[in-house]
Every structure is written in C-alpha cells, then in structure tokens.
A protein has these predicted regions:
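Short, low-complexity N-terminal intrinsically disordered segments enriched in polar/charged residues
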Residues: 17-43
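Exposed beta-sheet edge and beta->alpha loop/turn motif
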Residues: 89-151
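Bacterial Sec-dependent N-terminal signal peptides
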Residues: 1-21
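Short solvent-exposed beta->alpha transition segments
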Residues: 31-32, 47-100
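Generic anion/oxyanion-binding catalytic loop in active/binding sites
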Residues: 8, 38, 55
Length: 151
C-alpha cells in the first residue's frame, strides 16, 4: 500500500509543481504588463493604454471615448505619487468569459488629488497569448463626503 501511495505521489507531484510554476510565471508576466499599462495611463499615453485593452473590451468602447475618459480620470486623480502591489491571483475560468488564462491584480495607489485609491485590474491572454486588459476599476474615499459625514 505504501508503495502505491508513493508511486502516485511521484506521478502527480511533478505535475502539481509544474502547474504552480506556470501560474507564478503568468502572474509575473501579467503584473509587468499591468505596470506598463498603468504607466501609459499615468504618463498620458492614452492611445497606448487603449491598445492594451482586450478585443472583447474594444467591441464595446471606441478609442476616442476611452482616451477622453482616461484624460478626465487622470485629471481627477492628479499625478501618481506611489503605487503598491497588494494582491495577485491566477484563475483559469471566469463566468461569461469561459476558460482561459486570467490574472486579477489589486494595487493601492496614492495620487496627488486622491490620498488613497484602490485599483483593480483583470487581464487575460488573447488568441496571440498576449496579456490584455479585460477590466480596470478603482475605488477611493471622496474627501467631500468624508467632511460631510463628520458634521
């Protein structure tokens, strides 16, 4: 019995390790892509940021509207002071999108006009195995609302 258990472990352990190594590789690649994408956004390279969108996102948004939205958002945020990577994880399936390679990334960012901002990104690989933005979201506490709450 011990020999059978040992044999099973020897057969499946390399596969599990191999799988974990690839997940970490995907997370590293996706994080590098997101860092560059956010840099384009923060440096007003909005066309490059739009090109980082996945084709599925581009179906529902044109470049002019997206670039205008980027400009408005960065005007609201101000200059980036710092950004810290908080969370990353890999997922092989997303409801409505199906099977694929997806990485979820969360950052804590500090902008000139926004003291504390959480930025959330979902990236997926396209048909050419390139990472592309599927979703970008953010949240922050509005200082004006905070002042009203304290009254």
């Amino acid at each position: 019995m011990i020999n059978k258990t040992s044999l099973l472990l020897l057969l499946f352990l390399p596969q599990l390790l191999f799988s974990q190594i690839f997940k970490e590789k995907y997370i590293t690649e996706a994080n590098e892509f997101c860092t560059n994408w956010l840099s384009n956004l923060n440096n007003k390279s909005y066309g490059k940021a739009y090109n980082g969108f996945h084709e599925k996102v581009k179906l529902n948004s044109d470049s002019l509207s997206s670039c205008n939205a980027f400009s408005q958002l960065m005007g609201e945020f101000g200059t980036l002071n710092s950004r810290k990577l908080d969370t990353t994880f890999f997922q092989s399936n997303i409801e409505e999108l199906g099977d694929g390679f997806y990485v979820f990334i969360e950052y804590t960012s500090f902008y000139k006009k926004i003291d504390l901002c959480q930025e959330y990104i979902i990236v997926g690989q396209n048909d050419n195995l390139k990472w592309k933005i599927l979703r970008y979201d953010f949240s922050y506490a509005n200082e004006e609302l905070n002042k009203e709450d304290k009254k």
